[in-house]
UniProtKB/Swiss-Prot annotation:
<feature type="region of interest" description="Disordered">
    <location>
        <begin position="873"/>
        <end position="902"/>
    </location>
</feature>
<feature type="region of interest" description="Disordered">
    <location>
        <begin position="1031"/>
        <end position="1054"/>
    </location>
</feature>
<feature type="modified residue" description="Phosphoserine">
    <location>
        <position position="978"/>
    </location>
</feature>
<dbReference type="GO" id="GO:0005654">
    <property type="term" value="C:nucleoplasm"/>
</dbReference>
<dbReference type="InterPro" id="IPR040155">
    <property type="entry name" value="CEBPZ/Mak21-like"/>
</dbReference>
<dbReference type="GO" id="GO:0003723">
    <property type="term" value="F:RNA binding"/>
</dbReference>
<feature type="modified residue" description="Phosphoserine">
    <location>
        <position position="113"/>
    </location>
</feature>
<feature type="compositionally biased region" description="Acidic residues">
    <location>
        <begin position="882"/>
        <end position="902"/>
    </location>
</feature>
<dbReference type="GO" id="GO:0003713">
    <property type="term" value="F:transcription coactivator activity"/>
</dbReference>
<feature type="modified residue" description="Phosphoserine">
    <location>
        <position position="835"/>
    </location>
</feature>
<feature type="modified residue" description="Phosphoserine">
    <location>
        <position position="959"/>
    </location>
</feature>
<keyword id="KW-0007">Acetylation</keyword>
<dbReference type="GO" id="GO:0005634">
    <property type="term" value="C:nucleus"/>
</dbReference>
<protein>
    <recommendedName>
        <fullName>CCAAT/enhancer-binding protein zeta</fullName>
    </recommendedName>
</protein>
<comment type="function">
    <text>Stimulates transcription from the HSP70 promoter.</text>
</comment>
<keyword id="KW-0805">Transcription regulation</keyword>
<feature type="region of interest" description="Disordered">
    <location>
        <begin position="915"/>
        <end position="969"/>
    </location>
</feature>
Length: 1054
């Protein structure tokens, strides 16, 4: 029985008995030889200063388990071998060993004596010592101690009591979690368990964690309040009684310093967002909390976990029995649980704000949801539902923004394509969804960039597209934008799908039917889909080419927005066609279409023709002149059996001409045997044995039987003389047998807007990195030509330094114009430099004589001309200014007439002559102007006025000819006029009560009242500053100036 009961003495939680502690050391030395061989014995522990309790604790430890909190076996030890032993020996602890053993064993002896159990006698012999050694070896070799026997009933209540003490709460005086750093960087936060935990254990631990967390918060508050300092005092004042912005800033700082102990401020921010009242306060708190979540509160690589997802079954093992480590885990887990609930509440508030009546609030809530969805995985499902739901917003701005935000989300996280498309699909198939929301959702799906690794997603998208396609066809809603969006989506998803052929093949007949009734843009999408399907199977049918041949004459081609897409489709179709005569028919019709198109499309079509000629050299025979392609009239035989000839004009037949031809070919005697008209289509069954036409039929439906091989591409000759220089250059290049070498986009480079942009002489705004990134989905990247001459301003030195042969033909006009302008400005500068010379005294005196009158005191009649010199001087000043203005205007705009726009045929001499003569004006009224008969044919009033003014005294050309060298004296007869000549003016104003004779005389032809006339006179005085107030102000101002001048003169004299 002793051997069975002996292992109970070595239980970790049971104190050691004093009877076994007091043993003869000599006997122990004899019996511990086996333990010394293993390298671990009681004697070794006692020699190092330990006790028997230390020996038993070390003996029961498992080497594979953690020794201390955070320590593991195999960790790097910095201590060298024997270093610890030497340190303990230096302490001289051996003399205290026996005394410490006796003192520790006394309380254990008292406790064991009080129990009513069978006492084990003292170990005084070898048998008991051997049994003890065997039990120690068993404990040391096993991971856990052996189970207790039924006979030992004293240990069971002790274990139950220990289990009950696990959930007891003990207050501490120090913080378990130190402030600073991110809370999710602690190793405790990543511990979780996928197994469901018992609910009773979880509830008990949660209660304990709540108490621990509350005590931790209270302890943190007490220590914070006890701190003394300016920063802490200021922070407390701001949080409690500050403005909204200051309070938010202070709370952010506190949360960033220690998020675990400031969870109350996180809850305060959420309540501010929820608060109904000021929208400005709500939006401010919304942005603040969003930034806080992204930067500090939410981890990057995982979601937040609730409290029940923690490994409570391994909690004691993880903490190694250390209560502080266990409590730290509980506090951190409880904090994360509470934070997860607050974030979920915030997401619900975002959902409420996204349905607000104000557009600004909805937009801000949508943007916040998108940023959280892009940056953090927390609540991503709820946030994704919110953003996708905004595709159906009644306001188009919000729906468009939601589509754009989803595109940017997929650009940042491409792995979310399946999740996002599934959510959009659920939106599409809702029962109460609007058609506009469906359209926006389809537009988002067809903009999704796919890859060959995502064939399942492509198949799923094609299924959704054709489901809505059938719905649109059944509703006969083929003119809607939805059909075009669906066909666009199928075109983009088809190359990446694996089972798309079967689904498309079912709808081929429907696509051909829809092709002829929809608008041009939608028909281009349908043709592209048909070409992809047939080209992948190498079975491009004649039906497709006939439909494409017919679509080329659609008037919508001129105004559609998919001209580049259509030309690309034509190029691919012709390159894949093996029938050469059908390719000739397409090229012929394409050149015919260009006759009514704008220059950008013509340039693009000519470039396409050049590439087709490069791919199929057999088409070069069409460049040769055929007899039917001449512009002259031709006579050909109608039939081989008849001698009759008919008169036709090749390539310009109409239905009326055909009727006349058939009537002429029929003999007059046999009118009843008239031949039927030739049909515009040919049945397949009638191909064998039929006669081929030897002429071109432009109205044929089938390009195989239009006879395009019998004519030439004479349209190129007409295009070679086109008004647009680039069109003419492209056409001449093809006629000469060369290929067009062009690296740009003709549809964009030759537009009117691009031409007008060349007149804006400033550097364009730089594009901020959106063209060469993935932010612009499904858009072609822009080509940047660093040395492209088209990016140089046309008036720059670099542009003008180029040779004319290096300039594009559409910009030769700018090059020639600014070259001549530069030469003209240089000549003007040279002339101005030559004119700036020193003036001699004699020349200066002669110049003064032209302005001053030498005989002003000799003749009395000239004394009456008081303002003669003033008028002439002002006139001379005006002459000079007008001369300068006229010369400047001539330099800039004098030669831009209609006849002089084409500067290619104008020589430099002619340009200079026109410039010199263009700045002068004719002298209309000269000294002999009275003899001109055209000027004498006027009314009586005009002749009297001209006599009274004296036309001889006014020189209107003087302002353009500069100062006269000879002074012209005034005629005395112009000043003295008889009263008979203006007597009719006196008769009209007879009886009026105002001044009608003096200097301020006023005419009153409409017999206005005196009050009205006075008001007009006062108003005229006020306008010309002749009223009393204006005169007084002038006098005061004059006095002030005079005072200032006198003061200045006095200072200068001093």
């Amino acid at each position: 029985m002793a051997a069975v009961k002996e292992p109970l003495e070595f239980h970790a939680k049971r104190p050691w008995r004093p009877e076994e502690a007091v043993e003869d050391p000599d006997e122990e030395d004899e019996d511990n030889t086996s333990e010394a061989e293993n390298g671990f014995s009681l004697e070794e522990v006692l020699r190092l200063g330990g006790t028997k309790q230390d020996y038993l604790m070390l003996a029961t430890l498992d080497e594979n388990e953690e020794v201390i909190d955070g320590g593991k076996k195999g960790a790097i030890d910095d201590l060298q071998q024997g270093e610890l032993e030497a340190f303990i020996q230096n302490l001289n602890l051996a003399k205290y060993t026996k005394a410490s053993l006796v003192e520790e064993d006394e309380p254990a002896e008292k406790e064991n004596s009080s129990k009513k159990e069978v006492k084990i006698p003292k170990i005084n012999n070898k048998n008991t010592a051997e049994s003890q050694r065997t039990s120690v070896n068993k404990v040391k070799n096993k991971n856990r101690p052996e189970p207790h026997s039924d006979e030992n009933g004293s240990t069971t209540p002790k274990v139950k009591k220990d289990k009950q003490n696990i959930f007891e709460f003990f207050e501490r005086q120090t913080l378990l979690l130190r402030p600073g750093g991110k809370w999710y960087d602690l190793e405790y936060s990543n511990e979780y368990s996928l197994k469901p935990q018992p609910q009773d254990v979880v509830s008990k631990y949660k209660t304990l964690a709540q108490k621990l967390y509350q005590h931790e918060i209270n302890l943190f508050k007490s220590k914070t309040n006890s701190q003394k300092g300016a920063s802490s005092t200021w922070m407390k004042a701001i949080v409690s009684s500050g403005t909204l912005g200051d309070r938010m800033a202070a709370m952010i700082l506190l949360i960033q310093d220690d998020a675990v102990h400031t969870l109350q401020f996180v809850e305060t921010l959420v309540n501010l967002v929820k608060k109904k009242g000021s929208k400005q306060q709500c939006l401010m708190a919304l942005d603040t909390f969003k930034e806080l979540l992204i930067t500090d509160l939410l981890p990057d690589n995982r979601k937040l976990r609730i409290f029940s997802q923690r490994p409570f079954d391994k909690l004691e093992q993880l903490s190694s029995g250390n209560k502080d480590s266990r409590d730290r885990r509980l506090i951190l887990w409880y904090f994360e649980h509470q934070l997860k609930h607050l974030v979920a509440e915030f997401v619900q508030v975002l959902e409420t704000l996204s349905h607000d009546t104000l557009v600004t609030t909805k937009t801000r809530a949508l943007t916040v949801a998108h940023e959280l969805l892009c940056n953090k995985p927390e609540e991503e499902k709820a946030l994704l539902v919110q953003v996708v739901n905004k595709l159906g917003d009644p306001q188009n701005r919000i729906a468009t923004k939601a589509s754009h935000l989803l595109e940017t989300l997929l650009c940042k996280h491409p792995n979310m394509k399946g999740v996002v498309s599934g959510e959009v699909e659920r939106l599409l198939f809702r029962s109460n969804i609007s058609s506009k929301a469906q359209y926006y959702a389809i537009c988002f799906l067809n903009q999704m960039a796919l890859s060959h690794e995502e064939s399942e997603l492509a198949n799923k998208l094609i299924t959704v597209y054709f489901c809505f396609f059938r719905t649109c066809v059944k509703k006969k809603d083929v003119e809607s934008k939805m059909l075009s969006a669906l066909l666009t989506g199928v075109n983009r998803a088809y190359p990446y799908s694996q089972t798309g052929d079967d689904k498309v093949r079912e709808q081929i007949d429907t696509l051909f039917k829809v092709l002829h009734i929809v608008n041009f843009n939608t028909s281009v999408q349908a043709l592209m889909l048909l070409f992809q399907v047939m080209n992948s199977q190498q079975t491009i049918s004649d039906r497709y080419y006939t439909a494409l041949y017919r679509k080329m004459l659609d008037p919508g081609l001129m105004t559609c927005s998919k001209q580049a897409m259509f030309l690309n489709l034509v190029y691919k179709s012709l390159k894949a066609d093996i029938v050469l005569r059908r390719v000739k028919a397409f090229v012929k019709r394409l050149l015919q279409v260009t006759c009514q198109q704008m220059p950008p499309f013509i340039c693009g079509a000519l470039y396409l023709v050049s590439e087709i000629l490069k791919a199929k050299p057999g088409l070069r025979s069409q460049l040769d002149d055929h007899p039917e392609s001449d512009d002259e009239e031709n006579f050909i035989d109608a039939n081989d059996d008849e001698d009759m000839e008919k008169f036709t004009d090749a390539d310009k037949e109409t239905e009326i001409v055909k009727k006349l031809e058939t009537e002429e070919t029929v003999p007059e005697t046999d009118v009843e045997t008239k031949k039927p008209e030739v049909a515009s289509w040919v049945h397949f069954d009638n191909l064998k044995g039929g006669k081929q036409l030897n002429k071109y039929d432009p109205f044929s439906r089938n390009p195989l039987f239009c006879g395009a091989e019998n004519t030439s591409l004479w349209e190129l000759k007409k295009l070679s003389v086109h008004f647009h220089p680039s069109v003419a250059l492209f056409a001449k290049t093809i006629l000469q047998g060369n290929y067009i070498q062009y690296s740009g986009d003709p549809l964009q480079d030759f537009t009117l807007m691009r031409f007008l942009d060349r007149f804006v002489y400033r550097n364009p705004k730089p594009h901020k990195g959106k063209e060469n990134t993935d932010s612009v989905v499904m858009q072609p990247k822009r080509k940047h030509f660093i040395k492209d001459i088209r990016h140089l301003p046309v008036n720059s030195k670099e542009f003008l330094a180029k040779e004319e042969s290096q300039i594009p033909v559409d910009e030769v006009f700018f090059h020639r114009y600014y070259k001549k302008v530069a030469v003209k400005e240089k000549q003007k500068r040279d002339a101005d430099e030559e004119s700036i010379e020193d003036v001699d005294d004699e020349e200066f005196e002669e110049l003064i004589d032209t302005f001053e009158d030498d005989n002003c005191f000799s003749s009395g009649k000239d004394d009456m001309d008081f303002a003669g010199n003033v008028k002439k001087r002002t006139k001379g000043a005006k002459d000079n200014t007008l001369d300068e203005d006229s010369e400047g205007s001539d330099d800039e705009l004098g030669n831009l007439d209609d006849d002089e726009v084409s500067l290619g045929s104008m020589d430099d001499e002619e340009f200079a002559e026109v410039d010199e003569d263009g700045g002068t004006f004719m002298d209309v009224l000269d000294d002999e102007s009275e003899s001109v008969p055209e000027l004498e044919v006027h009314s009586k009033v005009s002749t009297k006025k001209s006599k009274r003014k004296g036309t001889d005294d006014f020189d209107f050309a003087g302002s353009f000819q500069g100062p006269r060298k000879k002074k012209r004296n005034l005629n005395d007869s112009s000043l003295f006029v008889s009263a008979e000549e203006f007597g009719h003016l006196l008769d009209e104003n007879m009886g009026s009560k105002f001044d009608n004779i003096g200097m301020n005389a006023m005419a009153n032809k409409d017999n206005a009242s005196l009050k009205q006339l006075r008001w007009e006179a006062e108003r005229d005085d006020w306008l010309h500053n002749r009223d009393a107030k204006s005169i007084i102000k002038k006098k005061k101002h004059f006095k002030k100036k005079r005072i200032k001048t006198t003061q200045k003169t006095k200072k200068q004299r001093k």
